[in-house]
Regions:
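Extreme N-terminal starter segment of soluble prokaryotic enzymes
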Residues: 1-4
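Short beta-strand-centered segment that lines the nucleotide-binding/catalytic pocket of NTP-utilizing
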Residues: 28-39
């Protein structure tokens, strides 16, 4: 049984590699499914969870949380509809990622899974890094963005990830000692990365 977590600098190809690993090993790939599971537990829409996730740790999130009145929350609860904010999202995130890992043989993309499963005996933690220029180029190529827009997205996601990890009490997500394998995607191609991860997992 193996649990593979994929952490990455945004635009380094983590989602692409994660899907390839899952396909190669015939493992499920946990990404958007995590959003759906959080939404189900909190009794809210997946879109609501996506919005919370996108703004986790940002100033906008804190501003919005202050704007939500207790009266509004009481009305939502009275209607037996759920409610979720940044803290509730993080609490559910920890529980759900741990639950997914307990089922075994899975690839989990991001969301602080390398921290949440740090002590999991069957977990392999992978980090992808790359030069910012290459990450911007990756976003242009794979998501059909202009160079300006791709740079904006990469910068925003870099800041958002740091904020999210701070909320989890961690600020050192690029510390190589957290990971079994760090892949510099500026030095190797996707096929080599796939081979390295699969060999590591299957040779245990």
């Amino acid at each position: 049984m193996a649990v593979i977590t994929i952490s990455r600098q945004f635009g380094s190809g983590g989602q692409t590699l994660g899907k390839k690993i899952a396909e190669k090993l015939n493992y499920p790939f946990a990404d958007n499914e995590i959003i759906q599971m959080v939404a189900k537990e909190a009794n809210v829409s997946s879109q609501w969870v996506e919005n919370i996730e996108k703004e986790a740790g940002t100033n906008l999130s804190r501003i919005l949380s202050k704007m939500v009145s207790q009266k509004w929350i009481d009305r939502v609860l009275a209607d037996e509809r759920g409610y979720i904010d940044e803290k509730i999202y993080l609490d559910y995130l920890v529980l759900i990622i741990a639950k997914i890992a307990d089922e075994g043989d899975v690839v989990i993309l991001g969301r602080g899974s390398q921290y949440i499963l740090n002590d999991h005996p069957d977990a392999y933690h992978i980090l992808l890094i790359d030069k910012k220029e290459s990450r911007v180029n990756f976003m242009e190529k794979h998501y059909n963005l202009s160079e300006k827009k791709a740079l904006q997205v990469v910068n925003f996601e870099d800041r958002r990830r740091v904020s999210l990890y701070k909320k989890l009490g961690k600020i050192d997500y690029e510390d190589p000692s957290l990971y079994h394998l760090v892949l510099n995607m500026n030095r190797i191609d996707m096929d080599t990365a796939l081979k390295l991860v699969c060999e590591m997992v299957t040779q245990k």
